[in-house]
Amino acid sequence: MVREEITGSTQTLEWKCVESRVDSKRLYYGRFILSPLRKGQADTVGIALRRALLGEIEGTCITRAKFWNVPHEYSTIVGIEESIQEILLNLKEIVLRSNLYGVRDASICVKGPRYITAQDIILPPSVEIVDTTQPIANLREPVDFCIELQIKRDRGYHTELRKNSQDGSYPIDAVFMPVRNVNYSIFSCGNGNEKHEILFLEIWTNGSLTPKEALYEASRNLIDLFLPFIHTEEEGTSFEENKNRLTPPLLTFQKRFTNLKKNKKGIPLNCIFIDQLELPSRTYNCLKRANIHTLLDLLSKTEEDLMRINSFRMEDGKLIWDTLEKHLPIDLPKNKFSL
């Protein structure tokens, strides 16, 4: 049997957005194409991007609400139409946009009679509401209504077992998934030896980011996932050559800054925030995810601690070191973060 050899297209791989629309404040749609792809590649890329878009994109949600003088979540409050459980469900639906990391506090404090909407939430500066008209409760009488809220940025779907709260604090099941749905389809074209595939990708988001932004973030997450394999290849080493090799002890930032901390005690390291270092967004986000907010937080970490951070690379460590040398008015040691 003679097998016909089929080659892929030699054209440059390109992607573009062919349709973009805003159906509502909480529903954005985008349609993209990627081509030309060799046979089988479109399915590989489509599956990977769909999983990354649905499971790896971070979102911001209200995760906890604290009411005053409320015995349990099924209670009703005089003058308020909704029960506590209904209010919690309404808070769960609030769509937020932010670049915060860690837990932040928010609140609602109003006096009836009036309708309470998402616009009445008092938020930290780094958080904004996508749809301010989302309903929360209806105050039918002139009563005071105050809630303390917790806001968090994360990924995936988080549930917490509800218990009878003694202080009126109740968890809210959080859906940290700004991408609502993803579909992909494949179209084959070409004749003979020039057959190739076109990948069509449809993305729906909740308005906290656009489909294009979601596609970019998902792509970056996939790239970061495969970077360790690329670095191994660049090093040109094999398992056989390294299996008996002793790993040298990791250098620490503490050692490099020992003299700094001794001789520069007047520098308020806890007042220098990492966003002042003008780091690239990828490196900055890695540090923020690890709750590293100030220079003091950074210098308290060993190189081993930093390498445990998800998506943190050796290049990030060198970049941080070079940035400190460039921007901070201090005498730094000459030995740099080694690659």
From Swiss-Prot:
Compartment annotation: Plastid, Chloroplast
GO MF entries: DNA binding; DNA-directed RNA polymerase activity; protein dimerization activity
Catalyzed reactions per annotation: RNA(n) + a ribonucleoside 5'-triphosphate = RNA(n+1) + diphosphate
Entry annotated with the keyword Hydrolase: no
Record's protein name: DNA-directed RNA polymerase subunit alpha
Keyword Nucleotidyltransferase: yes
Taxonomy, superkingdom: Eukaryota
Annotated GO CC locations: chloroplast; DNA-directed RNA polymerase complex; mitochondrion
